[in-house]
Amino acid sequence: MDVCMALIEGITNCAQLGEPDIVIEEIFEKMDAKKEVFPKLDAVTPPATILATNTSTLDVNEIASATKRPEKVIGTHFFSPAHVMRLLETVRGAKTSDQTIATVMKLARRLGKAGVLVGICDGFVGNRMYHHYTRQASFLLEEGATPEQVDRVIYDFGFAMGPFSVGDIAGLDVSWRIRRRRAETRPQDERYSPIAD
């Protein structure tokens, strides 16, 4: 562990990045914030550096548009907790190059992840399914079940953990931001449970 920790260096200024092969951005799930960070990364890293965003739902094309190298911008969605969860969604933007994709998929294998190439859609693969799963779980709470009961049934069904445990690990603020963003386009007639809000 000491050897691994010695390889990690914290910085507070993008200009301190040096000349990395890849930068994986990990800030909160808000488009304005990501579009503020990516031009800075673009300005201080060599043109060959891959700029990856660890977004769980946001449009990689919009993030890439904030740079001068959209062919080097890609999504790398690590699921929480990243040291346990094997899935790594590799999100191809409209202009992401084949070489960028190949490099990130190779990195996924080196990290022991199950890399899955996905396109642009709200929630990609994992969170697209998780959205419906948690929606139904919230309805169960409204009908009288407890979070522990719902999680236990899901666990007994064969999942690694239930939706409420996932929310606790990933951060309730993350799912709250996603719900707020999706509220703008949610059909009026779609049943919504405000219980998590």
Name every feature range the model reports, one short phrase each.
Residues M1-D197:
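N-terminal glycine-rich phosphate-binding loop for ADP-containing cofactors
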